[in-house]
Amino acid sequence: MTNIRKNHPLMKIMNSSFIDLPTPSNISSWWNFGSLLGACLALQIITGLFLAMHYTADTTTAFSSVTHICRDVNYGWVIRYLHANGASMFFLCLFIHIGRGLYYGSFTLSETWNIGIILLFTVMATAFMGYVLPWGQMSFWGATVITNLLSAIPYIGTNLVEWIWGGFSVDKATLTRFFAFHFILPFIIATLVMVHLLFLHETGSNNPLGTSSDSDKIPFHPYYTIKDLLGLMLLILLTMTLVLFSPDLLGDPDNYSPANPLSTPPHIKPEWYFLFAYAILRSIPNKLGGVLALVFSILILAIIPMLHTAKQRSMVFRPLSQYLFWILTADLFILTWIGGQPVEHPFITIGQMASILYFSLILIMMPVVSLIENKMLKW
């Protein structure tokens, strides 16, 4: 008798990806975040679809349509807050997923890593455009400030900004196109996720030791399906706690005021997950320099495989590199905090020091320390 799971054209793709997939036997809970990101993406697409049924992408009605969703639509408030806080959970899982890749040397799987960087940029663009849609004060001014950064590009900058706006300021045309892009991008992300998995399954997963797992693999199901399910339950618990007890904890109170082009909020700041990059942007007085630092703060991930000077792939047996990794983590926390503070002393200086430390750690300290650790192997 033929096994439909292994022979059916569609089923065998699912089977080789999620059931009979040979997986390293020792991957830890840090490997759970890939599946959690998939769950977050599914949540965002489903809740987003229901929100789009009631939302109107027009400057006169956008704000009131979001209010209508929260007040008049059945469980509209749950859907709206699941979508808003789901984005926060998405980025939390994303940062941990990237951190795990850095710590355990998963960036040596270059195709998977590069698709991951493209995914990160796409998710960030999607989240930014989504934040503009409620058309509150922070939505409007956030859109104005961030899109205006493109005007720093020499010669074509101003034309480029006006082309993106669809006019001479952020207005109806901007909101309409941002809604269109915000709707389509998650499906592009889902396609990129499939490519990400395709490349991952070409090489197989890394493991905490950074060694070859070829001699010791186990089937993905039931071992890791159960393990991922536990992670999913914990993620649902955290998300629902946030949604039901403190839905506005991570939001900005200014976004409960309708957009007013004539009144600038005292402190314009993005959502928490962009604050680290925003702090790096603000730490450089020159506009073009700030924009380049902002882009490079994320694009730097692409050159990490080239900066890998260690003989060992993982940081598990490299205590000095571990020390620098956790300093980098602490530095990102500091940058996130600084990004939410006003531009005044001492925050400016702290932000500049943290930005210098961020680039120094990745570009200089980590490669040098890895070389020292290589020498230590011979002692």
UniProtKB/Swiss-Prot annotation:
Subcellular location: Mitochondrion inner membrane
Coiled-coil residue windows: none
Consequence recorded when altering T191A: In strain: Isolate DUPC 6271m and Isolate FMNH 85134
Residues the record lists as binding a ubiquinone: H201
CC cofactor note: Binds 2 heme b groups non-covalently.
Residues where heme b b566 binds: H97, H196
Residue spans crossing the bilayer: 33-53, 77-98, 113-133, 178-198, 226-246, 288-308, 320-340, 347-367
Stored Pfam families: Cytochrom_B_C, Cytochrome_B
Entry cofactors: heme b
Effect of S257T: In strain: Isolate DUPC 6271m and Isolate FMNH 85134
Keyword Mitochondrion recorded: yes
Membrane topology: Multi-pass membrane protein
GO cellular component assignments: mitochondrial inner membrane; respiratory chain complex III
Additional detail: Heme 1 (or BL or b562) is low-potential and absorbs at about 562 nm, and heme 2 (or BH or b566) is high-potential and absorbs at about 566 nm.
Function: Component of the ubiquinol-cytochrome c reductase complex (complex III or cytochrome b-c1 complex) that is part of the mitochondrial respiratory chain. The b-c1 complex mediates electron transfer from ubiquinol to cytochrome c. Contributes to the generation of a proton gradient across the mitochondrial membrane that is then used for ATP synthesis.
Known partners and oligomeric status: The cytochrome bc1 complex contains 11 subunits: 3 respiratory subunits (MT-CYB, CYC1 and UQCRFS1), 2 core proteins (UQCRC1 and UQCRC2) and 6 low-molecular weight proteins (UQCRH/QCR6, UQCRB/QCR7, UQCRQ/QCR8, UQCR10/QCR9, UQCR11/QCR10 and a cleavage product of UQCRFS1). This cytochrome bc1 complex then forms a dimer.
Family listed: Belongs to the cytochrome b family.
Protein name: Cytochrome b
Organism (species): Lemur catta (Ring-tailed lemur)
